């Protein structure tokens, strides 16, 4: 994924996206989810600033497939590393992903055999700029 102005469709200079907080700093489980929509199927992705990719967990992928979401299989398996160890996944291209008031076209995703879907910096590279406001629990995504 990389910045291409024509891939981000919507009105306005930016869209503000609410972050859904999970846990607290006191229980060492502070995390944020972001709501996305892929061809009408809504889901939550864990915002992972340490992840390069945009991943779809197996549970979400099954929901997408059963809802008839089309995708392009790139016929490439990749290996990823993270806090949970290593995992293998298949690269696909999604026609469009809705986040906030924007629709993002041509999103490369890795389908993993794990339950969690991650929104990493790879997806955020589709925008010209991203501002993470931790106090307000928002992301500002700029065209």
Predicted feature locations:
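Pepsin/retropepsin-fold aspartyl endopeptidases
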Residues: 1-143
């Amino acid at each position: 994924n990389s910045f291409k102005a024509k891939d981000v469709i919507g009105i306005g200079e930016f869209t503000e996206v609410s972050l859904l907080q999970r846990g607290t700093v006191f229980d060492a489980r502070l995390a944020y989810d972001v709501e996305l929509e892929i061809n009408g199927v809504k889901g939550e992705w864990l915002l992972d600033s340490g992840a390069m990719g945009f991943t779809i967990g197996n549970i979400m992928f099954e929901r997408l497939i059963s809802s008839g979401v089309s995708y392009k299989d790139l016929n490439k398996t990749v290996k990823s590393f993270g806090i949970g160890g290593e995992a293998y996944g298949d690269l696909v291209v999604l026609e469009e992903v809705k986040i906030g008031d924007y629709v993002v076209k041509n999103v490369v995703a890795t389908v993993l055999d794990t339950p969690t879907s991650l929104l990493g910096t790879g997806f955020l590279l589709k925008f010209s700029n991203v501002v993470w406001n931790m106090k307000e629990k928002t992301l500002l995504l700029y065209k």
